[in-house]
């Protein structure tokens, strides 16, 4: 059977069918159980981060090294020709694509990875996050973690809490989970940071069900997954940030009455929306979730670069 992801650009989670997602997750499970340290040797992958990142960049680079490939790139675009000399993104990508087998790109501008894919020729572009738009590889590790903890991706009750307006992780994850049957979403956010209408419209089109709530407590007993997010200071003006940053904070005492199988996830970094006492509960799974980023990204890279 042909690999449908070979040399494919991964810009949006909507670029992947349910079958594609299942292939990535199966591959991730295999690589987690049985590492393959020479699978991508001697390929070279560019890591181009035009926006600050810790987990995504390091997990991508770890994934690349553990598959036997080499990584080149930058984590601060201000020291590149684009940053210092005014080179266009199109020209930057046109040149880098001549050097490498794939390009991982994070950019603050929505649509930048899609634009990059128009100038990369045959070199695949993998979106590591573009503004408030999409974060498909975070979604892959989230799906992998949900499947790992719940043994399924359908018929789940999933709460998404916090910044649902600017949080690209919840945009991508809700769209991905809508490809699976029977999932219900509980959206819990301040009115100013509610899930955008275009995401709700997409869920309606796919037949997914959702409800919107003012607090976690009223839905907690129903939940299988509680997906917390931080309020993104960098995308808000100071007065708006001050008004909403502490509106939804999860404490260990809030988890009394939760289902035994509940897992609390977070794309990280957290600020103060999950208190440290939650870390000691059996529900906390966000650090294991972060580790799973290595396996999900290994799986995607191996499928994109191996026929």
Swiss-Prot record:
L-aspartate binds at residues 85, 168, 230. Pathway: Pyrimidine metabolism; UMP biosynthesis via de novo pathway; (S)-dihydroorotate from bicarbonate: step 2/3. Carbamoyl phosphate binds at residues 55-56, 106, 135, 138, 268-269. The keyword Transferase applies. Keywords: Pyrimidine biosynthesis, Transferase. One of its GO terms (molecular function) is aspartate carbamoyltransferase activity. One of its GO terms (biological process) is amino acid metabolic process. It catalyses: carbamoyl phosphate + L-aspartate = N-carbamoyl-L-aspartate + phosphate + H(+). Its EC number is 2.1.3.2. InterPro entries: Asp/Orn_carbamoyltranf_P-bd, Asp/Orn_carbamoylTrfase, Asp/Orn_carbamoylTrfase_sf, Asp_carbamoyltransf, Asp_carbamoyltransf_Asp/Orn-bd. GO terms for cellular component: cytosol. The keyword Transferase applies. Belongs to the aspartate/ornithine carbamoyltransferase superfamily. ATCase family. Heterododecamer (2C3:3R2) of six catalytic PyrB chains organized as two trimers (C3), and six regulatory PyrI chains organized as three dimers (R2). Catalyzes the condensation of carbamoyl phosphate and aspartate to form carbamoyl aspartate and inorganic phosphate, the committed step in the de novo pyrimidine nucleotide biosynthesis pathway. NCBIfam families: asp_carb_tr, PRK00856.1. HAMAP family: Asp_carb_tr (MF_00001). This is Aspartate carbamoyltransferase catalytic subunit. It comes from Photorhabdus laumondii subsp. laumondii (strain DSM 15139 / CIP 105565 / TT01) (Photorhabdus luminescens subsp. laumondii). The lineage of its organism: Bacteria, Pseudomonadati, Pseudomonadota, Gammaproteobacteria, Enterobacterales.
């Amino acid at each position: 059977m042909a690999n449908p992801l070979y040399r494919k650009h991964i810009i949006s989670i909507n670029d992947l069918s349910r079958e594609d997602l299942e292939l990535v997750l199966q591959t991730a499970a295999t690589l987690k159980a049985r590492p393959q340290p020479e699978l991508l040797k001697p390929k070279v992958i560019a890591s181009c981060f035009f926006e600050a990142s810790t987990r995504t960049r390091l997990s991508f680079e770890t994934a690349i090294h553990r598959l036997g490939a080499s990584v080149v790139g930058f984590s601060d675009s201000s020291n590149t020709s684009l940053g210092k000399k005014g080179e266009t993104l199109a020209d930057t990508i046109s040149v880098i694509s001549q050097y490498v087998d794939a390009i991982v790109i994070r950019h603050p501008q929505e649509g930048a990875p899609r634009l990059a894919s128009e100038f990369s020729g045959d070199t695949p572009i993998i979106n590591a996050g573009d503004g408030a738009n999409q974060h498909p590889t975070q979604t892959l590790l989230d799906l992998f973690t949900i499947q790992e903890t719940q043994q399924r991706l359908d018929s789940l009750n999933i709460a998404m809490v916090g910044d649902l307006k600017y949080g690209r992780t919840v945009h991508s994850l809700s769209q991905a989970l809508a490809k699976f049957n029977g999932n219900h979403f509980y959206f819990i956010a301040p009115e100013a940071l509610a899930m955008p209408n275009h995401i709700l419209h997409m869920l309606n089109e796919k037949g997914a069900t959702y409800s919107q709530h003012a607090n976690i407590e009223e839905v907690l007993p129903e939940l299988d997954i509680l997906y917390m997010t931080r309020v993104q200071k960098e995308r808000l003006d100071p007065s708006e940030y001050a008004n909403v940053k502490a509106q939804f904070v999860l404490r260990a005492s809030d988890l009394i009455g939760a289902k035994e199988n509940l897992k609390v996830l977070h794309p990280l970094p957290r600020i103060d929306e999950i208190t440290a006492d939650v870390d000691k509960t059996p529900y906390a799974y966000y650090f294991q979730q972060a580790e799973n980023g290595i396996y999900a990204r290994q799986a995607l890279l191996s499928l994109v670069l191996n026929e």
